Amino acid sequence: MVSAGIEAMNVFGGTAYLDVMELAKYRHLDTARFENLLMKEKAVALPYEDPVTFGVNAAKPIIDALSEAEKDRIELLITCSESGIDFGKSLSTYIHEYLGLNRNCRLFEVKQACYSGTAGFQMAVNFILSQTSPGAKALVIASDISRFLIAEGGDALSEDWSYAEPSAGAGAVAVLVGENPEVFQIDPGANGYYGYEVMDTCRPIPDSEAGDSDLSLMSYLDCCEQTFLEYQKRVPGANYQDTFQYLAYHTPFGGMVKGAHRTMMRKVAKVKTSGIETDFLTRVKPGLNYCQRVGNIMGAALFLALASTIDQGRFDTPKRIGCFSYGSGCCSEFYSGITTPQGQERQRTFGIEKHLDRRYQLSMEEYELLFKGSGMVRFGTRNVKLDFEMIPGIMQSTQEKPRLFLEEISEFHRKYRWIS
């Protein structure tokens, strides 16, 4: 049987970031409560960044490493996002153009809140496993932006949003799926999926979200349990404690993952409290490192955790990683795969940690300028030209490699420019 899974994976965690402890102090938040979020930094989208630029900048190093023949075998491009820029035209059309991909390629977009990345990934994996086009590859790009602008006439933030703001991130993860899954070989058929209608969080308007944070937590925990129980039915003998050497979770913020892990260890694995913290540090913490520096990037959040797990974990032998994906509304899935020492070595060549280290650190004054909507491009903008010098100094921090930015919108058509 043919293998399928991740041949390469890269993260783009933004051009700029904010220290979230500085934000908490500036907003006069309860720092004890804030520390439970387990967050350090959040990526902040600049006015001339959008889900297209994030997606292209994540995928370009993967594409550049391919030969022309390999690049031409990308026959499926799926973008996964809840930050779409048009009701009809998908992000994939722009991304396809700026990556210079073969025109004999299916391209489209999927949406189901934070589950979208897994939805796209599973479609790609099954395309490869189907062998309808032997040797083909698929490119899956999950790209999302939390860009919540203060409504006109109201500067006050609700308490709920004040604590959600520090974890709201921006970024993209690009995943190349094919028959040579050096980085992460999927366990075929080892999937537990679970979904139902619930009004926990949603985006009824383009630049904000609505919902019930308590209900969202309860739904997340319910799905975490039910997806694994379904996985267990399909994989006899699977054990939450022993089958997986690592666990990667959809990560809105680290504290939520820690709570979910604790609940699963008590309820499903029947582990005593004394052993849970050690297990968390060993199997889960490696996957939180990048998430703590980027924030919640919705459809891409699980893959950010997976990339972090592979980069930061110890893979002296092949090890199995269990993955939990959750998207509000809701749909969820638990699945697994294998990463080898060679896979970790391959994954580390993308230098994700170095990329995160080189981002521009925003001051609170600069962040507030962006947060209050100065120069931000709202959904449905017909014409605009972007000012790359809005915050002096940022563009100098991007000179390491060519990077794509949004230059203008002309009669709704987005035009981008490479800058190095």
Swiss-Prot record:
One of its GO terms (molecular function) is hydroxymethylglutaryl-CoA synthase activity. The active site is at residues 82, 114, 250. GO terms for biological process: acetyl-CoA metabolic process; antibiotic biosynthetic process. It catalyses: 3-oxobutanoyl-[ACP] + acetyl-[ACP] + H2O = (3S)-hydroxy-3-methylglutaryl-[ACP] + holo-[ACP] + H(+). InterPro entries: HMG_CoA_synt_C_dom (IPR013746), HMG_CoA_synth_N (IPR013528), Thiolase-like (IPR016039). Signal peptide: none annotated. Pathway: Antibiotic biosynthesis; bacillaene biosynthesis. Its EC number is 2.3.3.-. Keywords: Antibiotic biosynthesis, Cytoplasm, Transferase. GO terms for cellular component: cytoplasm. It comes from the Bacteria. The keyword Transferase applies. It is an enzyme of class 2 (transferase). Belongs to the thiolase-like superfamily. HMG-CoA synthase family. Involved in some intermediate steps for the synthesis of the antibiotic polyketide bacillaene which is involved in secondary metabolism. It catalyzes the aldol condensation between the acetyl group attached to the acyl-carrier-protein AcpK (Ac-AcpK) and a beta-ketothioester polyketide intermediate linked to one of the consecutive thiolation domains of PksL. This is Polyketide biosynthesis 3-hydroxy-3-methylglutaryl-ACP synthase PksG. It comes from Bacillus subtilis (strain 168). The gene is pksG.
